[in-house]
């Protein structure tokens, strides 16, 4: 439950505070309104049991039982995306929305296998998203990175084929990073070692991350770091259960990309206040605050910041630390990092009366 009031001054400060988003699935920004527009435009047939109206779909989104329940709707939603313009429109809608929320840098996920399995080429999907990223830079000065995710519930051979088909996009740097998502516990990181090694062989500059420690125990995090050689962990909340792992994350500056509202919606915790955010701060484990699949989980990045404030009531200095470590943990170049760090200082100095 909320313990601290988000006053107008707090809300304004958190809105203006420069933000980096590192855990955002572009397909997870598919709002019900756009979903039904694309159904109409593309003549897509949804399952007979699927909600018939925007309001009915919102009710479903407010009551997911767990990760798998959410994923079932997430993959149905992907079926309405067919053309390059569809993918562009989806991502552009996201960038427009967060441009007013202080977002300055976005490293965004997408799931090609959700689309190639329907006969849509990797190039079509990537080009649509790439166009939206370029427009976000041009119109909003939001810098971006594209992270291609492998779906861990798919056969490993199919994941390997996806990496092979992305060879030229990885070599050219259009794809900046490789990630791993979907159902965690049945599909541990050790299954995907060769996929990661192959992708890295295409471009030594390719960044590596993976979902771990959301539903899986801390060993999923440790094995992801050791076997997949990632430099970042997506989610990672259950790392707190392993004291040695916490020391390692702090020492190696492995950033956790945390998603508070997602963790509540998918029953990882009952309330944002139960998340070990203060423990991560106390132990110098770097983390960023992100929205995951905001169309499904009831809040974009600013709402996640506000929800965290309402539970923890952190001072301006703590929020500045979170903003700075989010920038330092980003994959943008040093010049861009310095620009963003300067922006953080400007905003912090502006709110002189805020504790």
From Swiss-Prot:
Key words of the record: Cytoplasm, Hydrolase, Metal-binding, Nucleotide metabolism, Nucleus, Zinc
Q: What class of enzyme is it?
A: hydrolase
> Which sequence ranges form a coiled-coil region, renumbered to this chain?
none
What are this entry's molecular-function GO terms? adenine deaminase activity; zinc ion binding
Tell me which cofactor or cofactors this protein depends on: Zn(2+)
Enzyme Commission code(s) on record: 3.5.4.2
Which purpose does this protein serve, as stated in its record? Catalyzes the hydrolytic deamination of adenine to hypoxanthine. Plays an important role in the purine salvage pathway and in nitrogen catabolism.
A biological process (GO) of this protein is: purine ribonucleoside monophosphate biosynthetic process
Q: Which family does it belong to?
A: Belongs to the metallo-dependent hydrolases superfamily. Adenosine and AMP deaminases family. Adenine deaminase type 2 subfamily.
Protein name, as recorded: Adenine deaminase
Pfam families cross-referenced by the UniProt entry: A_deaminase (PF00962)
Q: Which CDD domains match?
A: ADA
* Active site (record annotation): 214 (proton donor)
**Site annotation Important for catalytic activity: residues:** 235
Q: Where does substrate bind?
A: 293
């Amino acid at each position: 439950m909320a313990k601290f009031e988000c006053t107008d001054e707090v809300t304004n400060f958190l809105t203006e505070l420069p933000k980096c988003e590192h855990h955002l699935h572009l397909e997870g920004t598919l709002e019900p309104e756009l979903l039904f527009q694309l159904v109409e435009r593309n003549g897509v047939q949804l399952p007979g049991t699927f909600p018939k109206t925007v309001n009915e779909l919102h009710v479903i989104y407010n009551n997911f039982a767990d990760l798998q329940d959410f994923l079932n709707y997430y993959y149905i939603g992907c079926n309405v995306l067919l053309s390059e313009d569809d993918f562009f429109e989806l991502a552009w809608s996201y960038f427009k929305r967060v441009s007013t929320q202080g977002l300055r840098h976005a490293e965004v996920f997408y799931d090609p296998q959700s689309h190639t399995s329907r006969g849509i080429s990797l190039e079509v999907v990537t080009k649509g998203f790439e166009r939206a990223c370029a427009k976000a830079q041009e119109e909003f000065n939001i810098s971006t990175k594209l992270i291609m995710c492998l779906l861990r519930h798919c056969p490993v051979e199919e994941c390997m084929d996806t990496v092979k088909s992305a060879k030229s996009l990885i070599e050219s740097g259009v794809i900046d990073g490789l990630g791993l998502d979907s159902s965690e516990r049945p599909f541990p990181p050790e299954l995907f070692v060769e996929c990661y090694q192959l992708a890295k062989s295409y471009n030594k500059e390719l960044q590596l991350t993976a979902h771990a420690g959301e539903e899986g125990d801390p060993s999923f995090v440790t094995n992801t770091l050791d076997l997949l050689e990632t430099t970042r962990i997506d989610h990672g909340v259950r790392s707190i259960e392993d004291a040695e792992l916490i020391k390692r994350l702090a020492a190696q500056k492995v950033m956790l990309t945390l998603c508070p509202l997602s963790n509540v919606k998918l029953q990882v915790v009952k309330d944002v206040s139960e998340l070990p955010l203060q423990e991560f701060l106390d132990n110098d484990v770097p983390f960023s605050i992100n929205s995951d699949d905001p169309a499904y989980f009831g809040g974009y990045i600013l709402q996640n910041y506000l929800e965290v404030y309402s539970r923890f009531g952190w001072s301006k200095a703590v929020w500045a630390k979170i903003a700075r470590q989010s920038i330092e943990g980003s994959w943008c170049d040093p010049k861009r990092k310095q620009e963003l760090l300067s922006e953080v200082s400007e905003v912090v100095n502006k709110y002189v009366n805020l504790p």
